[in-house]
């Protein structure tokens, strides 16, 4: 397990630590699991990702003799796929529904009359998906600047193929004039599709490819009536809050032994993140943050 130290867009370090991680979907995690994981692993550091909490937790506190460290807290957005497509659409305003229809129609017109999007879920198909999605991902600023694109290594491809054999993966691609312009990758566990990677080519942003692909995928999933949830993964953002009409407030909770090494790790992390936040706030006050983002994207694209 690693805890990345980031300053703005840059990852400064990723200390790797061995620890016991609770392996449960966030929808099944309860407060008592903190006690249970400590009982099961009394001599190990422990981590509970996306633990639902009723209110924000202090970043550092004590819990059962451990150093409880909470680096991230966020709304985790999701969609209940059992409610039906009509009911889901009804949770959007009439203005938003009309906007979605316009976006789909605009992309269809640019594509010659129909939107060309495809689903991949077989061992052979998922390899084709990966190859084409990597072509898109490699050109996005998220990958070139943030190293946050679809992984390209052999081990990841082998994992995709294994998941496809077990029926536990979906890949989606959106095409324009025969060329991929957007992708969505979703692993599947316990009947839950997880939004893992979404990317699109910035030069086609006027066609809203990421939004259109997400909308069409969700429509198909509702009609398929096979899965329980679409989980937008940890973290927040406009895309997730637009589509994920339900959410739970969650925290990543580290239960660490109170050693000097763990204390140094925690307080170093806090120092870096606080300094990064101060720098971001200063740029915002000076109205330079948007300009800095545009320059960073241009540098990545150049």
Stretch-by-stretch model annotation:
Residues 1-15, 51-206, 301-302:
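A conserved beta-strand-loop-helix scaffold within acyl/acetyltransferase catalytic domains
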Residues 2-12, 65-84, 228-288, 292-295, ...:
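Active-site/acyl-donor-binding loops of N-acyltransferases
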Residues 4-72, 190-248, 254-255:
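Acyl-donor binding region in acyl/amide transferases
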Residues 28-31, 84, 122, 258-260:
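Intrinsic-disorder/low-complexity, polar/charged segments
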Residues 31-40, 124-127, 158, 162-166, ...:
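Polar/charged alpha-helical tracts
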Residues 53, 94-109, 133, 170-175, ...:
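A broadly tuned preference for mixed-charge, low-complexity surface segments
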Residues 88-89, 144-145, 202-204, 221-223, ...:
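A short, structure-level motif marking secondary-structure boundaries and short turns
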């Amino acid at each position: 397990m690693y805890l990345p130290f980031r300053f703005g867009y840059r990852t400064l370090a990723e200390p790797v630590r061995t620890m016991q991680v609770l392996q449960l979907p966030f929808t099944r995690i309860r407060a008592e699991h903190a006690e249970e994981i400590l009982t099961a692993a009394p001599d190990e550091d422990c981590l509970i990702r996306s633990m639902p909490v009723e209110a924000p937790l202090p970043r550092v506190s004590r819990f059962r003799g451990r150093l409880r460290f909470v680096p991230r807290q966020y709304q985790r957005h999701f969609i209940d796929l059992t409610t039906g497509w009509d009911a889901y659409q009804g949770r959007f305003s009439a203005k938003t529904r009309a906007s979605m229809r316009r976006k789909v129609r605009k992309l269809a017109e640019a594509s010659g009359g129909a939107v060309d999007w495809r689903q991949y879920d077989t061992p052979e198909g998922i390899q084709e998906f990966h190859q084409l999605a990597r072509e898109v991902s490699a050109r996005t600023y998220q990958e070139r600047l943030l190293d946050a694109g679809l992984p390209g290594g052999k081990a990841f491809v082998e994992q995709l193929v294994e998941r496809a054999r077990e029926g536990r993966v979906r890949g989606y691609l959106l095409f324009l004039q025969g060329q991929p312009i957007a992708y969505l990758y979703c692993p599947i566990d316990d009947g839950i599709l997880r939004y893992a990677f979404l990317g699109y080519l910035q030069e086609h942003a006027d066609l809203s490819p990421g939004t259109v692909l997400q909308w069409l995928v969700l429509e198909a999933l509702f009609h398929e009536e096979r899965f329980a949830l679409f989980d937008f993964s940890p973290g927040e953002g406009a895309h997730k809050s637009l589509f994920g009409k339900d959410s739970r407030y969650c925290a990543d909770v580290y239960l660490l032994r109170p050693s000097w090494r763990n204390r140094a790790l925690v307080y170093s992390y806090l120092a870096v993140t606080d300094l990064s936040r101060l720098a971001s706030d200063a740029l915002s006050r000076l109205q330079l943050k948007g300009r800095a983002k545009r320059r960073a994207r241009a540098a990545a694209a150049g």
